UniProtKB/Swiss-Prot annotation:
Claim: Chaperone is one of the keywords in the record: no
Deletion consequences: Partially penetrant phenotypes when temperature elevated to 25 degrees Celsius which include embryonic lethality, reduced brood size, egg retention and an increased incidence of males.
Alphabetized InterPro entries for the sequence: GYF, GYF-like_dom_sf
Protein's job: Involved in negative regulation of early and late embryonic Notch signaling.
UniProt xrefs under Pfam families: GYF
Protein name as annotated: Suppressor of aph-1
Keywords: Developmental protein, Notch signaling pathway
Domain GYF: from-to ranges: 12-60
Any one GO cellular component localisation term in the record: cleavage furrow
Length: 245
């Protein structure tokens, strides 16, 4: 930035620089140049100039003259900055940049920005809110996934019902003997449902019906099967041929 005249407004300096491919880039504002410098894209060997001067100078020349980088203070050009600093020292010697100053600032490493990178947009990357990947999830990653949203679906309920029906189906040999209704036990899921439908106990102050004791007897009729049926049942149970004489 620099002042336009003695009492003019402060104008932001625009910069041009030479990339590693010797191509000219710019103009860019001082805030953009400062962002790329802090990100590690620039070093002391960077060739740059303001829009107010025809010749390029290294970033190291600016840093040695000012004691820091030139992107956070009002500057017009390197020559104008030297003249301004000389005017502030009327009794001192004129400050001149040594001719061989550029050779003292060897780049420690190649500059890492690619030629095709849209440099003016870099300083906006941290100003556009959270990364796009954060919008793909409907909840924060720290929150656990709700298991109810995954297990209580129509497909899972149908699969559970099919498994219950398969477990409740009697063996084939009971069906062949007409005994499919004997020995059938309620499934665990049915026991839970039956337990849920048990009426709750009443309060102690609520009157109940008088208990009536009764004795009940029952007679179980025997199941008659033939030798052939018994032989087939035993063969299926033992896994080998059984012959009843």
């Amino acid at each position: 930035m620099h002042k336009n005249g003695n009492n003019g407004p402060v104008i932001d300096t625009k910069w041009h620089y030479l990339g590693p491919d010797s191509e000219k880039y710019g103009p860019y504002m001082s805030k953009d140049m400062l962002f790329w410098l802090q990100a590690g894209y620039f070093n002391d060997g960077l060739q740059l100039k303001t829009e107010n001067e025809p010749n390029y100078h290294t970033l190291g020349e600016w840093s040695q003259l000012l004691g820091t980088h030139p992107f956070s203070m009002p500057v017009h050009s390197l020559d104008a900055t030297i003249a301004q600093m000389n005017s502030m020292r009327p009794h001192g010697a004129m400050m001149m940049v040594p001719p061989g100053l550029q050779n003292q600032f060897q780049p420690p490493m190649p500059m890492r920005f690619p030629p095709f990178l849209p440099m003016p947009l870099l300083h906006q990357m941290n100003q556009n809110g959270p990364p796009m990947g954060a919008q793909m999830h409907s909840q924060p990653p720290s929150e656990p996934i709700d298991a109810g949203s995954l297990s209580h679906t129509p497909d899972s309920e149908n699969e559970t019902r099919l498994n219950e029906q398969t477990l409740q189906q009697p063996p084939s040999w009971l069906i062949a003997l007409g005994l499919a209704g004997h020995g059938r036990k309620p499934h665990h899921h049915q026991q839970i449902l039956a337990h849920q439908h048990i009426p709750q106990m009443q309060h102690a102050n609520v009157a109940t019906d008088q208990v009536v004791m009764k004795s009940v007897e029952c007679q179980t009729e025997p199941v008659e099967i033939s030798k052939e049926q018994a032989s087939r049942v035993l063969s299926e149970l033992l896994g080998q041929m059984v012959i009843i004489n």
